[in-house]
Amino acid sequence: DAATGEHGDLLDIIRESCGLVDFHDVADEARRFLNLPRSEQEPSPNSARPPAQTGSPEAARRLFAMSQPMMRTLAETYLRNRGITPLHEAGALRFHPRCYYRPDDYSPTEIWPAMITRVTDLDGRITGAHRTWLNPAGFDLVRLGKAPIDTPRRAMGDLLGNAVRFGVATDVLAAGEGIETMLSLRCVLPTLPMAAALSANHLAALLLPPTLRRLYIARDNDAAGDGAAIALTERARSAGVEAITWTPRRGDFNEDLRGIGVDVLAAALRIELIPQDVARFMHVDAAETG
């Protein structure tokens, strides 16, 4: 589960809910649950894939592989309720209808639907995953569609220097903290490669592609966001990369998207872009706004 690195099939659920350890006992309980006859040749416990280490990249890869395409799921509804549309990010975003959540080591496991995003390194290898547990009851202005639990967002795997990536960066990249923040910017700049580092500390430590020439930093409008932008700017410039910081009017760019609308956001970003990047990355309608 989310705490052990084992994610989501029937055997996992039976083992967790019944407190079983031995594979034969779990298999027997599964047969009883499904009204299946006992097979003549029992499967060997050694044939089962061993559980991945808690929080490891392998656990993250398994979780992402077990998730399903996002379109026409609660994850798509969640993003649309956050103002994020159209969606072009089918590769990085997936959905798990029954993703395990455990508040702490001493609490029982809960099951909630979740948006699953992959974290990758500069070569595109999956190094981690991020989970946003969702509320199947719908959207509200307090939780914004996230599940009513203590920590509805959690990441796992090797995160430092890596990111949730939208598009493949070569010479130009936009980077920020949150997934929804960067997806909000993709509504205006649908072909600009972007990276969500998942936190201010990780944004400051983001590894930059060796071919990068210009970096747009989409900071959050708080002290942590300011510190991350300063640190990343210094690192970029020391590597010979031009760094330009974008600051939202509100707390982050998703708040801007929902509060001022896509047209006003596009007009604000247009004047922050290098002229050739307007023609290269901004949607024609957005580029003509204002």
Predicted regions and their residues:
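Short, solvent-exposed polar/charged micro-motifs at secondary-structure junctions
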Residues: 38, 98-106, 139-140, 254-258
